[in-house]
Every structure is written in structure tokens, then in C-alpha cells.
Amino acid sequence: MAIRIFAILFSTFVFGTFAHAQEGMRERSDWRKFFSEFQAKGTIVVADERQTDRVILVFDQVRSEKRYSPASTFKIPHTLFALDAGAARDEFQVFRWDGIKRSFAAHNQDQDLRSAMRNSTVWIYELFAKEIGEDKARRYLKQIDYGNADPSTSNGDYWIDGNLAIAAQEQIAFLRKLYHNELPFRVEHQRLVKDLMIVEAGRNWILRAKTGWEGRIGWWVGWVEWPTGPVFFALNIDTPNRMDDLFKREAIVRAILRSIEALPPNPAVNSDAAR
């Protein structure tokens, strides 16, 4: 009898919690117009925490649960890994350019963590990955519950060409932990990474974000901080026209955030087109 009562109570708790979570998620099919305006196919998840009750808004919920390569959005957790493992000391450490000419001119010079994040300097993170190693990277990924937590690769960087994959919904969960300093890393390291993520700011708001692109899929993830609370976002879109499609990531997100007053009208658009 006791077992049966426990089972009933457990089922009630689990399904009640699930139902409550679902009640907080709203499909915004009307946001299709923002994707159509730029002839883009994709998904966006917005978690608005400016009120007491968090509201999760999503366009294309099915796609928002599908995992893709994180590309350079992975620089957010990867920087935490590097700091924790000692591959990077702080934001002032200079990493000397190896002299190899790469396709992005901004990559062909000495770097620090701030420039590496801003310019999506891949070779810096390749150095970090080599020093950290696959086994330790896997442990880190599992500790932060990041996507499929698989850093294996047969060719290329595991966060671009390898097996690591994450869904837009999972990006939001990770970003929330970072915002609240709830990741298993030193608080000062989490604060530093958030500082590196700043894209722009106004009198009473701050936009922190990171782009990503692996050739077929483009990302923009981050959040806007307001005095009343943060608004998290994670967008991914198909990029059949490759670099010609990259501006659409920020354009769509900004239009959607402005539509719910999570960004001021027509703020300056950052032109980051790195992957």
C-alpha cells in the first residue's frame, strides 16, 4: 500500500511539474513574419524573466528541440574550460599569432580573450582544446549538461565539425546558469566570460551574446539584462547562402526582441559575421 501511495504521489509530482512547465511555454507562430521577412528558416526561443513568472516564447518548438553543432557559440563555455584548466590565465594574457594567414583578417594578429571572443578567433580555441584534451572536455561538458556532451571528432574542431551538438532550448538552460553564476566554475571566471560577451549597452540595459556558424547553420544566443530581469534568446537558422545569410541572425533576433520591448527601438546593429 505504501509503495502504491508513493507511486501515485510521485506521478502526480512529475506530471504536475511537466504540465506547469508546458503552461509557461507559448508557441509564437506569428513570429514567422520575422523569418519570412529575411527569407530564413529556423527557430528562436525567448525566455522572458522580467516578470515574477518566467515566460518562454518559441517559434517552431520542434526545431527548438533539435540539436545542431554549436559552432562559435561554444566559445562561451569553452572559455570557462580554458580558465579552469589553466590554458588561459585572464583577459590580459596575450596569445602570439603563429604567422599562418587565415581567411578572417582579424585572426591574423596577436589575441587575448576579449579579441578572441569578439572576432571568433578559432585558432585560439584550437590551442585551448589541445591543452584541455578530449577526456577533460567531456567531463566539463557533462558537468554543465551541455547538449549531447560529446567532444569527439574524426576531422576538424569538435564544436564545429565534430559530434558536439546542442538544441536552442538547451542553449537557454545553459545561459540561465551562467547568468546566475550557477555553473561549476569559479564565480570570477563566470563574471569574466559574461563581460567578454558584451555586445552593446544602453543607460539601463546590457546585451550579451555570441554568434556561431558552421557553414550550414547560424546561431545567435545570449540575453538582454534589464533592471527588472533578463530576457534570454537562442536562435538558429539555415544558411544555404553561407556568409550572405549571416546578417539575418542578429536582424531576426533584434526585430523579435524589439517587438516585445526587450530591446530599445532600432539600436545599432553589430556587424559580427564570424563563425
From Swiss-Prot:
Catalytic reaction(s) noted: a beta-lactam + H2O = a substituted beta-amino acid
InterPro entries xrefs: Beta-lactam/transpept-like (IPR012338), Beta-lactam_class-D_AS (IPR002137), PCN-bd_Tpept (IPR001460)
Signal sequence segment: 1-21
Keyword flag Glycosyltransferase: no
Active-site annotation: 72 (acyl-ester intermediate)
Record keywords: Antibiotic resistance, Hydrolase, Plasmid, Signal
GO molecular function terms listed in the Swiss-Prot or TrEMBL record: beta-lactamase activity; penicillin binding
Binding site residues for substrate: 210-212
Root EC class: hydrolase
Pfam families per record: Transpeptidase (PF00905)
Family: Belongs to the class-D beta-lactamase family.
NCBIfam families according to UniProt: bla_class_D_main, blaOXA-2_like
Function, as annotated: This is an oxacillin-hydrolyzing beta-lactamase.
Protein name as catalogued: Beta-lactamase OXA-3
Organism of provenance: Pseudomonas aeruginosa
The encoding gene: bla
